[in-house]
Amino acid sequence: MESSASPPRSRKAPEERREEILSEAASIALDEGLERITLRAVATRLGVRPGLISHYFPAAEDLVDEAFVRAATIERERFFPDAGSPLERLAHFVHHIETGASLPLARLWLNARHLSRFIPSLEATLQEQDSLDRARLRAIIEDGVASGDFAAVDPEAASIRILIAVDGGGSYVNSTDDLTHPAHVHFVADVAEWTLGLAPGTLGAVATS
C-alpha cells in the first residue's frame, strides 16, 4: 500500500529565504504601497507562517525599510543605464519618466515621503536613497560637461534641480485629472534642457532616434 504522506519540504538556506522575503515585500511596496507590507501579507504571498517572516525581520518597520531599498535599487538601475553617451543616458532617464515607466516608483516615493513623518528609520533610508539617485544623475552630468554635451554647469546643483522637477511631477501621480498637457508631460525634460544649456526638444529627439 502506497503512503499518502506529503514529501518533506526542503529547507531553504537563510540567505535565499531572506532574499525571497525581501523580493516579495518590494513587490507589495510597488503594487500596493509600503503600508501594505505586514509580516502576515508577505507570509501569505509566500505560503508560509508569519512566524517565519518575523524570524528574519522581528519588526515590520525593518522589513518596510529594506523593501523600499530593494524596490528603489531595482528601479534605479532602470533609470540610469551605464551604456551610451551622457546625452543618451540623460535622454533615457527623461524618456523613462515621460512614458510612464516610472509611475510605480513615483507612487512609492510619494508614499514613502508621507510615511517617513511617522517612521524615523524610513526618513533616514529616504535620505540615503535620494543621495544615491543624485550621485548617479550627477555622474551623467559630470560626464556631459567634460564631453561638451552639456554647458559648464555645477553638476551637483544641476542634479538637484532636475530631481526636484522629477519629484514635483511625481506629486501628481495619484491624480485623476487630465495631465496630458505638454507643459506637464515634458516638465522634467524642459527643466533638464534649461539647466544644462540644451536646445528645447533635444532630449526627446535623442530618446526617439
Can you annotate each of these PLM segments?
Residues 1-16, 201-209:
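N-terminal intrinsically disordered/low-complexity leader segments
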Residues 20, 24-62, 66:
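Helix-turn-helix
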Residues 20, 24-32, 77-78, 108, ...:
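Solvent-exposed, amphipathic alpha-helical segments
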Residues 58-62, 80, 84, 117, ...:
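Residues in soluble alpha-helical coiled-coils and helical-bundle/repeat scaffolds
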Residues 66, 77-107, 158-162, 185, ...:
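Hydrophobic alpha-helical connector segments
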Residues 69-75:
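Short, basic, alpha-helical segments at the C-terminal edge of helix-turn-helix-like DNA-binding modules
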Residues 101-124, 174:
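Amphipathic alpha-helical segments used for helix-helix packing
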Residues 123-127, 131, 145-209:
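Hydrophobic/aromatic-rich alpha-helical bundle segments in the mid-to-C-terminal region
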